[in-house]
UniProtKB/Swiss-Prot annotation:
Localization per Swiss-Prot or TrEMBL: Cell inner membrane
InterPro entries: Poly_Biosynth_Transport (IPR050833)
Function as written in the Swiss-Prot or TrEMBL entry: May be involved in the translocation process of the nascent O-polysaccharide molecules and/or its ligation to lipid A core units.
Native organism: Yersinia pseudotuberculosis
Membrane topology: Multi-pass membrane protein
UniProt-recorded name of the protein: Putative O-antigen export protein
CDD domains (alphabetical): MATE_like
Keyword presence, Lyase: no
Length: 437
């Protein structure tokens, strides 16, 4: 029996993520020893910006993936799509470089102003170094999306794992006498994140160069379609980032370094659960996109029934294992640092993962069929609620309040709206098809 391609892709993602998670866990111990609790807190705040810089392609990666999937479903060539996406992204990256050089003193002061052991110049240098590395890393997103659309997502999963391995090797060889914490933080960023940037650029060149001989690749309609659809994905991604990526920004303004490090360790631990399911959704995206192009929406309902249940089981089982091993995990990652996993936070992180399984599935369904309007309607409200509720919760109740605010933003908005919108959209498409017949 032939194993479905999306299962192979998901399995490769799980394997590579296990490698990456192990490396991230091991790096916590190295970085805590190298930088101390305060220095590592700075490293985690800066590292949280990776998700923001992945938005630097303005949604072109997701748009390109969908367009390639549609063409593959109709047995059409797509070299012009790849080259058009690369041409479109060049001025975008030039703009980001200018913004980084101009705004780094102000952004670094906002993010790192609470870390008094760094002066303004040191904060700005740390931010600029990290920003240029993360911006370069985002270039690889184009190649990864192409491989996913070609049902070769296992390549996109292996490369980040390889980057993590190389980054860990560099980090382990980094000497430090603790005399200059700012330089230690910068060199740690270099060691840990530059491999991902390097492999990302190489991957994109590998996919693009063979297509350069394509004639008439600069089609205005193709370019317009990519940018138009990419704009929708970009808007949604920005709003999603305002929901999911503001936690470290809020904590940098409201909580002490110790709470920030505790949150970082727990989020990485529970993040393994999220990635297991997210990898499955990523591998299913092109499958759903092709099914949508053929109006086979019964496939969506099969996926809904099978994989949401699977996600719930994974969350419950993994959370129980984390509860049993909580002391062991802390002793391995931060020996002698007196950190611990409160039961209240374990319960909240577990419930949050259940909510994410539910909402992320329907978000992927809607994006795979190119229906982003329900996301545009709901996510802005969620973004406002997420930031404000996390801030109020963190100020009044610490980490527990921050997580409660994040979860509440999902329950009030997208957890019910996205399933309703997906079913309504499919019913409308099916009805229109019947009328045409």
């Amino acid at each position: 029996m032939r194993v479905p391609t999306h299962i192979i892709v998901a399995a490769s993602a799980w394997g590579s993520r296990l490698v990456s998670i192990f490396i991230q866990f091991y790096s916590i111990k190295i970085l805590l020893d190298l930088l101390g609790t305060e220095g590592y807190a700075v490293f985690t705040v800066i590292g949280s910006l990776v998700g923001w810089f992945l938005l630097a392609d303005f949604g072109l990666g997701n748009s390109l993936q969908n367009q390639i999937s549609y063409r593959r479903a109709n047995h059409q060539e797509y070299q012009d799509l790849v080259l058009s996406a690369v041409i479109a992204i060049i001025p975008i990256f030039i703009l980001f470089i200018i913004l980084i050089l101009t705004l780094s003193p102000y952004i670094s002061e906002f993010l790192l102003g609470g870390f008094d052991f760094l002066n303004n110049n040191q904060r700005s240098n740390i931010f600029k170094v990290a920003s240029f590395i993360f911006l370069t890393t985002s270039i690889g997103n184009l190649a990864y999306k192409i491989w996913f659309s070609e049902h070769k997502g296992w390549v996109s999963n292996i490369i980040p794992a390889l980057s993590s391995i190389v980054g860990l090797v560099f980090l382990m060889r980094l000497p430090s006498d603790g005399s200059n914490i700012s330089e230690d933080i910068i060199f740690s960023i270099y060691c840990f994140y530059i491999p991902a940037a390097f492999f990302g650029v190489i991957s994109t060149l590998f996919k693009v160069i063979p297509y350069l001989k394509c004639k008439n690749f600069l089609n205005k309609l193709t370019l317009y379609t990519l940018i138009k659809n990419g704009g929708g994905f970009f808007l949604f991604s920005v709003l999603s980032a305002l929901v999911l990526q503001v936690d470290y920004i809020v904590m940098s303004q409201t909580l002490v370094e110790r709470d920030l490090v505790t949150y970082n360790i727990m989020s990485k631990t529970f993040g393994l659960i999220n990635f297991i399911y997210a990898a499955l959704l990523q591998s299913l995206w092109p499958v759903c996109a092709e099914a949508s192009s053929k109006l086979r929406f019964d496939n969506f309902y099969k996926i809904e029934k099978k994989y949401i249940s699977f996600g719930f089981i994974i969350v419950i089982a993994s959370s129980f294992v984390i509860f049993l091993l909580k002391d062991f995990i802390v002793n391995i990652l931060a020996p002698g640092k007196d950190f611990y996993f409160p039961i209240s936070l374990i319960i909240l992180f577990s419930f949050y993962q259940v909510v994410r399984v539910w909402t992320d599935t329907y978000a992927m369904f809607l994006m795979s069929i190119g229906k982003l309007k329900p996301l545009w309607i709901s996510v802005p409200f969620q973004a406002v609620l997420s930031g404000s509720l996390q801030w109020v919760g963190a100020v009044n109740y610490g980490l527990v309040g921050l997580l409660c605010g994040l979860i509440a933003s999902f329950l009030i908005t997208v957890s019910w709206w996205l399933p309703f919108s997906f079913r309504s959209t499919v019913d409308r498409i099916v009805k229109d098809k019947r009328l045409d017949e």
